[in-house]
């Protein structure tokens, strides 16, 4: 079981991710648990700040398919994986498994 920190994720999508990742412990930034993976909503955060805050933790960023600027910024910041929101919904367990392997 991985501890997954959600950064900038709205409550609706948090509930969706918790349903998609029932085998993992999903927390928010106010948690004291050290994360194994960070999942960040690129449209709601600054990718560089998240990458700087978690330099040793794998980061999975997501946004909508029209946010090409956000996708580029997350890649440039060094996120380990950057996907569109629909791909995260389709492949969340596999993406987390790849990042924690």
List each model region and its residues.
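Short, charged N-terminal beta->alpha structural module
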Residues: 1-27
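Structural motif
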Residues: 6-11, 39-44, 62-64
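Phosphate- and divalent-cation-binding pockets in alpha/beta enzyme and binding domains
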Residues: 16, 69, 91
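Short acidic low-complexity segments
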Residues: 26-34
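Output/docking surface of receiver
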Residues: 29, 78-93
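Conserved acidic residues
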Residues: 36-37, 80
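Mid-chain, well-packed structural core segment of small domains
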Residues: 43, 48-81
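Receiver (REC) domain switch/output surface
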Residues: 94-101
